[in-house]
C-alpha cells in the first residue's frame, strides 16, 4: 500500500531511497534540509515499502491584494508506479494541506505536450489558462 507522508524535518531519512524519475535531478541534501525548514514550503511523498515513488511540492503564495494561493511547484511519480492514482492522491492531499493553512486557490503550470499531466488537471476541474513563460538568469 502506498503511504502519503507530509515532509517535516523529522522525516528526512525518506530521501535516502528514491525511485527513478520522481525528481528531475538527483537529491541534494543541503537543498532538502533548507526546503523542509522554510515556512510555506510543503512536500508530500508517496512511499511504497520504504521507497519514495512520488512527490508533490508546493509553496504558499501570499499577496497583499489577493487571496492566499497554493502554488503546485512539482508533481512526479516513478514510471513503475504511474497510472495507479498516486499523483491524484498526492495533489488531493496537498490541496487539503493548503486549505488547512488558509489557501483559497491553487495554480500550477505544465508543458502543453504533457498529456498525462494535462489529463490529470482537467480531471480535477482545472481551468486551463494561457500565459507566456520566461526563464531569467539571476
What is each PLM-predicted segment?
Residues 23-44:
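Active-site rim helix/loop that mediates acceptor-substrate recognition in acyltransferases
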Residues 45, 51-60, 71, 76:
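Conserved beta-strand in the GNAT
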Residues 61-72, 82, 129-130:
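A conserved beta-turn-beta hairpin within the catalytic core of GNAT-like acetyltransferases
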Residues 77, 83-96, 119-123:
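Conserved acetyl-CoA-binding loop-helix of GNAT-fold acetyltransferases
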Residues 78, 111:
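Residue-level recognition of the GNAT/N-acetyltransferase active site
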Residues 98-109:
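Conserved GNAT acetyl-CoA-binding A-motif
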